[in-house]
Amino acid sequence: MMADNSNQPREYDAVLGGHSQIPIAGAVLGGIAGVKQRFNSPSIEARIAAVKDAPKYGGAGLNLAIEALLDPAAEVQRVAYLILRSRTEPLVRQALKDFVPYKLFDCIRTVKTGTNVAISPGGDRTASLHGKIIRICDVDTGEILYTLEKYPRAQETFVLCQESEVFVRSRNTPKHRAIEIWHEGELRHTSLGHEGEITAIVISPDSQVIASGSADTTIKIWNLETGKLMCTFGSLLTWGAHKAGIVSLAFSPIAQTLASSSSDGTIKLWNLRSRECSQTIKGYANCLAMSPDGQTLATGGWDRNIQLRQLSNPDSSITLAGHFNSINAIAFSPDGLTVVSASADGNIKFWNASTGENFYTLSGHQSSVTCLTFSSDGETIISGSIDKTVKTWGVN
């Protein structure tokens, strides 16, 4: 049976009675008392060492690690967060729920890719164009999972499904405007119907339907499983439809509402059950996102600003200003408390969704950031850029 050495001196243990050497009459504080003494030190290194030791001392140690999340030094916060995030104790989970880790984010992985990058909603896979080939790759390793050929002289837009196995792309040629649904590299369905260039595609969070928007001013809803057209929102069929080409689309989390923006200067909300336009908001938007509770709409534009609107009162909005170029993509954190934006200025910004405060900025891409998403657990974000890289950002 090993002796309990928890009270024996360790590196950074506080010594009473001296500074440079342990005096004969000095006393060394060990155990949790020593950890607390080191944690109260002005030395960042001493506080980090204390936090690393803290979990050895049960509940008292965990309380100290939780307290370290509020330390003024980001280095100490980072160590505490990395120690605590895998713990399951209710007290720890609550503390992490109240903690915002994004201000500790750095680039933890960079993978070379192609152009026209798309990222799956969970951040597991990417699709990108490499010359005449579209590659679908694993985000973590960069491994090529399968490839597809690009159509000659065709303009293409593509998206990946939540489950990642499904790949959807638009094919715009002078003769054809088609939606193609692929499963692990095998073409399942080709859906025709748009008369103009297909400019936007989005898959519902429940992976049941696809929405496509076109320069022909219409929005079409397709069944993802069968490829069949379910309905069309257009000026000839629907009251309140857009009068110009569609720019961007976004589903609500439970896929009951679709948001659309158009070059006609309006943003519209569509009720997918009644198949009616439920709201029209004046404004231009290059990209859209809806909060996890479906109550807030975020819009980003060429004016470099982001607008947050409560759908219960869409005429009132919070403006998020700080980017130096147009906004290309927006996402909400899984808890809905943080908005993250990607811009043509090459930066990624984090915003408090309630106050509009920009509390952190990530720089690392060498060119315009075109897409981003949160990982399913919210612990990382994945971004794609014109610089032909996909970056994963998290606490390292």
Question: Where are the predicted features?
Answer:
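Residue-level detector of Asp-centered blade-edge/turn motifs that repeat once per structural unit
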Residues: 121-122, 162-163, 205-206, 253-254, ...
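Blade-level signature of beta-propeller repeat domains, shared across WD40, Kelch, NHL, RCC1
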Residues: 370-396
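Hydrophobic beta-strand positions that form the internal "hydrophobic ladder"
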Residues: 126, 166-167, 210, 258, ...
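Short coil/turn segments within WD40 beta-propeller repeats
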Residues: 132-134, 174-179, 196-199, 216-220, ...
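Hydrophobic core register within WD40 beta-propeller blades
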Residues: 117, 157-158, 201, 249, ...
